[in-house]
């Protein structure tokens, strides 16, 4: 009994599988389509929109219709020559003309300059009255004062630099004038501005014995040596830089060495030996002086 039932179940399963795998006839397909709704038949399998695209299109249409400043797409050509589409942000209008620069009349500039000299910051009611008198907006007056303050700061920086250069030049000229008049006897000598004279006691080793003998003080003026005249620019007087504007003063002083000869001989040998130019003067004149003394 159990075996017969099993055979019957297997036979039924085979028949059901055959009915499922058997294709339907055209008549059955037409009957099935007649029962389906018409909306389902209109949609084809390859024409489904991308997910979210319908919502985006609807949003774009509604926003573009309600907002005149809606973003727009334009085609641009990049550096490689390819054309691509970019989206301009909302509120950016390339067709809008640029704001023209405000041009002030001579009368307006004169009044603004006078007010700036009186007070550099005009705010509140004063700015309102001034803008009404000059037929300008408060923003234009405000921007003009801001630009004027910036310009004044730049001018003050340039004036301070020029003032420092002028003060250094005046101090150097006063020192040189005192040197020329003989009133200043203590500062170190300037090889570029004084005649090539040598003052001091020089010692040379004695070749005949281990001791040393002192040589006479040399007060004569040796011949002109080009190495003793370095350029006056760049040297220091009391740690003050000498600018290049003193070229005329140096030429005037060097053209009259006789007026400075007596004063320069009175300068102490201690300052001359401790001068900042000592390595230059001693290294150059030592060999020539030794040769003269040995002769």
Swiss-Prot record:
Belongs to the EMX homeobox family. Residues 204-222 have a biased composition (Polar residues). GO terms for molecular function: DNA-binding transcription factor activity, RNA polymerase II-specific; RNA polymerase II cis-regulatory region sequence-specific DNA binding. Its main location: nucleus. Residues 97-156 bind DNA. May play a role in the specification and maintenance of basal forebrain identity. It comes from Xenopus laevis. The keyword ATP-binding does not apply. This is Ventral anterior homeobox 1a. Residues 20-33 have a biased composition (Basic and acidic residues). It is found in: Nucleus. InterPro entries: EMX-VAX-Noto_Homeobox_TFs, HD, Homeobox_CS, Homeodomain-like_sf.
